[in-house]
Amino acid sequence: MNIVGKITGITYKVLLTEDLKKVEIKNFDINQMPSSCLLTDNKNSFAISKWVSPKRTRSYPFERVFNTLNISKKITVIPIVKDEGGKGDRDFIQWDTVSLMSLLDVFVIFAYYTEAEKADLKIINQQFDNKYVYSKIKEIEQYHSSALHWNLNELNTNLHNIIDKVKTSYADIEKTTGVKLHNANGLDNFKDKIGKDVSLFMAFSRGKAEKAQSREFVTFQPKESLSTLSKAKVTITNYLGGQYFLTVDEILLTKDKVSLIEGKHSKNAILPRISINKFL
C-alpha cells in the first residue's frame, strides 16, 4: 500500500524536549558544544543543533532539531558530505532534508569537515570548520527574512563553493591521516548533478529517496515484533516543494482513520530510547 498525503499548513505542540544548556557565543566551538544548546550574547539568543551526518536515518538528528523547536530562532548545522573512508560510507545531503528544516522554520548552515582521526581503514572524530560555522551564525544573527529564504539562498549561491571546500579539506585529511577516502570524482558528480538550480537538486535527491523507500519497503527487521504484515509506503508532499518518501512498519485501518505503527527494538534496554521516537 502507498499512503499519500499533503501538508497544507503546520501546527504542533512541543513535548518531551530536553533543557538546553546555555553557551555564550564568545565561547562558541561547534565541535565542543552539545548536540543541541542555547547560544546567547548580550542582545540575542537562539537555539542551535548539529548533525553528525547528512543522512537522516543515522544518529537520530531529528531529535536534536526537535529539542530546539520551542525557541523562536533555530539553527541547525549539517555537513553536506561525510566521507568515512574508502572502506566506509559516504553520505550526501538531500533536498528534502533542507525542505523539512524550512517547513519547521529552521535555518540551515551547510558545513564541512576539516580535521579527522585515523581508525584502521576509516576516519573518525571529524571536526567542522569552526570559523566558517561561526561566521554563518553571525550572518544569521543579522538576518531578518525567513529560514526558507535563507536556506534557498544558501543552496543557490553557496553550495558549489562549499563542495569545493569539501574537496580540498578531504584531500588534506587523506594526506594527514593516510586513510584512502572515496574518489573525489563523486564530489564533482554531485556538484554537476545538483547544478546551480534548486530544481535540479530537488530532482536528483528525489530519485535517490524514492529508490531508498523501495528498498526499505521490502526489508523486514526480525527483531521487531509486528502483529501484521502490513508494511506500507508513505509519500508526503508539502507546500514548499518538499516530498518525503517514507515507510511505516504497520498500518491499522478503522473506518475513516489510518493508524501508522512503527516498530523499534533495543539490544540491551527494555524499551528503545525516547530519542528514537521524538520525531516519528
Residue ranges with predicted function:
Residues 1-196:
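Terminal, charged accessory segments of proteins
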Residues 14, 109-115, 203, 219-222, ...:
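Intrinsically disordered, low-complexity regions enriched in small/polar residues
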Residues 181-223:
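Solvent-exposed, charged helical/coil patches
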Residues 212-280:
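Catalytic core segments in nucleotide and nucleic-acid processing enzymes
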